[in-house]
A protein has these predicted regions:
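Positively charged n-region of N-terminal signal peptides that target proteins for export
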Residues: 1-4
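Sec-dependent N-terminal signal peptides
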Residues: 6-10
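Bacterial Sec-dependent signal peptides at the C-terminal "C-region" and cleavage site
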Residues: 12-22
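Non-membrane alpha-helical secondary structure
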Residues: 20-23, 27, 51, 55-58, ...
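Low-complexity, Ser/Thr/Pro/Gly-enriched N-terminal "stalk/linker" regions
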Residues: 20-93
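Generic structural signal of hydrophobic/aromatic residues within well-ordered alpha-helices
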Residues: 27, 31-35, 52-55, 59-66, ...
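Aromatic-lined, polymer-binding surfaces characteristic
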Residues: 67-336
Length: 470
């Protein structure tokens, strides 16, 4: 009898392992389709001729510029003439971003470099240089910790998922080992001995948007290595971001979001968190790895009862964008796009109780924007398809948002009237900073938390070129 039980348990274990292996492969293909904008018959069945040509034209231009900068046949010290310092996290990350774009062009049919043998060779040489001279086990973090522990390993995951068939296994192995070295645990930052020389040398619990990023690093490695335990480890580390906090970073019961301990940040850093969560929900949906932790429901509530007020005229109110308001390459409309994109992805994985309301928020944000039709400017075709589906679905009605919402924990208030007038008030207290400046950004934001009042008409372009001119 014992032998029969052991045999049955073994069979169940094998079947479970085989099923998980198929699910991991499915998640990888889904991610690959998302990254490449090439239909794999998952979320993208086909793409229009216009979108295809637009994607090819963009990749042709980018790949030409990138190849002109590459110096892999002239030196083994760096990859690009513009990023020669292989001890700089910034130069390594920029090099990887360019290689990532080159891989996209190489793998996209009808581009000028599609399946070009020399380009494939240059990609591998470039990654080998980085694996030996830049992102290496035993190296020290010089400069911004984020580049070494989040930016680089996240980009590496995407590169290795997209380029699994063209990147040499020895190079992949070295880069993954370096990723584990610099960011070993999804729950912590500053854990590597390399962090001692960075801008944030101390071990600390990874919170908010940073926790989503560190979890995605672990999740991506689990997908690449087909390691179910690593995938579960990443997913289990995500649940904490949905737990309401009473002080410091995170979401609050009144749907506020704080980052950097005392800055109202539902916008920029909230977007990072939502983006990471959206990827998890989208990629793990309909698998045994799906996120089912009850605390994630809190984030759905924050979206429906919080972001519905902060998304005004298709933009995100600037009182919750911290220092990013001073950047001359963005606006409230631009900063809202990744939030709306994330909500669209989240809606596809949310249960029916929340899905319809989130779709209604997305539809309202798109239709309220009379400056541009926002889906047309979305480069990711998976997301663009979802956005267009939501807009065209007559059963989805834009959410009717009216009344006053007080975000007491981040000292913000928003009021939306029946006549289309909206206003928001930005305050500060002993809990909340009056403004944030860092990295030479927002150095004149002195009074933006002193009761500053934002008054909106229905014109979405009112504040498009406002901040950076001050």
């Amino acid at each position: 009898m014992k032998k029969i039980i052991v045999f049955l348990a073994l069979i169940v274990g094998i079947l479970s392992f085989n099923n998980q292996s198929k699910e991991i492969e499915g998640m990888k293909l889904k991610w690959k389709e998302f990254l490449l904008n090439i239909p794999h018959d998952i979320s993208l069945k086909e793409i229009s001729k216009e979108n295809k040509e637009k994607n090819i034209d963009k990749l042709n231009k980018s790949s030409k510029d990138i190849l002109n900068k590459m110096r892999v046949y002239e030196t083994q010290d760096y990859v690009f003439k513009d990023y020669q310092n292989m001890s700089s996290g910034n130069h390594i990350l920029r090099s990887l971003k360019d290689i990532q774009t080159l891989i996209k062009a190489y793998l996209t049919p009808d581009t000028n470099v599609y399946k070009d043998k020399e380009v494939k060779e240059m990609i591998n040489i470039g990654l080998e240089i980085i694996s030996e001279r830049g992102y290496v086990v035993g190296a020290m973090e010089k400069g911004n910790w984020w580049e070494w522990e989040i930016g680089i390993p996240k980009t590496l995951n995407e590169i290795l998922i997209m380029g699994e068939e063209i990147i040499e296994s020895e190079i992949s192995s070295k880069l993954l080992k370096a990723s584990y070295y610099f960011q070993p645990d999804p729950e912590f930052s500053g854990l590597s001995p390399a962090a001692r020389t960075s801008t944030s040398p101390n071990k600390r619990v990874s919170k908010g948007g940073n926790r989503m990023d560190t979890a995605l690093v672990t999740y991506g490695r689990g997908i690449i290595e087909k390691n179910a335990s690593e995938i579960k480890r990443a997913i289990n580390s995500v649940a904490v971001v949905g737990e309401y906090v009473e002080k410091g970073d995170g979401f609050y019961k009144d749907h506020s979001f704080i980052q950097h301990e005392n800055v109202a940040y539902s916008g920029t850093y909230g977007q990072v968190l939502l983006n990471g969560l959206a990827q998890f929900i989208y990629l793990t949906g309909d698998t045994s790895f799906e996120i089912n932790n009850p605390s994630i429901i809190n984030i759905y509530d924050v979206i429906i009862k919080g972001y519905s007020y902060l998304l005004i005229n298709g933009g995100i109110n600037d009182s919750v964008n911290g220092r990013s308001i001073s950047r001359d390459d963005s606006s409230d409309l631009g900063r809202a796009k990744p939030i709306i994109n994330s909500l669209a992805l989240i809606s596809r994985g949310a249960n029916s109780e929340y899905r319809s309301k989130i779709e209604s928020i997305v539809k309202k944000a798109i239709l309220d924007n009379n400056f541009e039709y926002m889906p047309d400017s979305v480069n990711n075709l998976v997301i663009a398809n979802i956005l267009n589906e939501i807009v065209k679905d007559k059963n989805i009605k834009p959410l009717d948002v009216r009344g006053t919402k007080v975000f007491s924990y981040m000292d913000r208030a928003v009021s939306i009237g029946k006549n289309g007038i909206k206003f928001a008030i930005s305050m500060h207290s002993n809990r909340i900073a009056n403004y944030e400046t860092m990295n030479k950004e927002n150095i004149r934001g002195w009074y933006t938390g002193d009761g500053m009042t934002y008054i909106y008409t229905n014109n979405s372009s009112d504040f498009v070129e406002y901040w950076y001119q001050l």
